[in-house]
Amino acid sequence: MKRLHALLILALSLVPIFTTAQERPANYARAPRFKALVYYSENAEEAHVQFSRQGVEFFRRLTVGEGFYLDVTTSLSDYPYEKLKEYTCVIMLDDSPHGPAERAAFEQYMENGGGWIGFHASGYNDRSTRWPWFSRFLGCGVFKCNNWPPQQALADVDLSDHPVTKNLPTSFVLPASEFYQWEEDLRVKDNIQVLLSLSPKNYPFGIKDIVYGGDWPVVWTNLNYRMIYLNMGHGDECFSEATQNLMFVNAFRWIVSRDPAGDPFDK
């Protein structure tokens, strides 16, 4: 009887511990949760390669503790659809697929629930690109203009309750970069959510090549796909600002968490 009484007291004493643990759970990975692929080109413009090399290191640092596997490639010709589909997301830093085979594999990957995080030049397309699917995928049409040289810019959050922007300030300064403007209006499209834009307070924007106005989204998602495009990615300063880096991590986590097979972070 005394032993039963002692066990009851012990059990009751543990209740607050278990309650606290449930209120503040921690989910430690017992194995890598998923695989991600980083793609960039060493043959791109020098400033884009600078960004890409830093980008590779940025995402590699996120693997510390083996939370996920990260593969890096400079050739998508080695990744047909059957291989691409092994990855929860593909991160393109300064280039996009080339040629019919690479493009077809990427289209199939995205149409079947693949994840894509694209930076700056990875989304560049003009009338010579001749890839209508990619233009629709991005939602912005073809290239219109850009500022030059790379400059810092004030950015405004458009959607403050989105997972990518919910912990960002309403406005913040982006590190120096070149930013693209596009031909088509993203805001009139039901399938596009604009998350971040350059503030009109930046105008006139540029020293050599000057942009005088216009709506300028720089981060958005196409709701028909598991994707996000981030317009920044020129030079070696893009990872120098904590708020922007936080947004990059948010974007990565959001894309990964929406894997059709289930949220890897819940494993």
What would you call each of these model-derived segments?
Residues E23-F34, F58-R61, K201-V218, N222-K267:
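Extracellular ligand-binding/catalytic regions of CAZymes and related secreted enzymes
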Residues Q54, F58, E86, A101, ...:
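Extracytoplasmic/secreted proteins, especially bacterial periplasmic and envelope-associated proteins
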Residues W148-N224:
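Catalytic beta-strand/loop cores that center a nucleophilic Ser/Cys/Thr
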Residues G115-I117, Q193, R226:
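Proline-centered loop/turn at the N-terminus of a beta-strand
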Residues L7-I17:
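Bacterial N-terminal signal peptides
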Residues M1-L4:
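Positively charged n-region of N-terminal signal peptides that target proteins for export
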Residues N27, K35-D126:
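Helical hinge/lid and interdomain linker segments adjacent to catalytic or ligand-binding clefts
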Residues S96-P169:
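A glycine-rich, often tryptophan-bearing local segment used as a flexible ligand/cofactor-contacting loop or short
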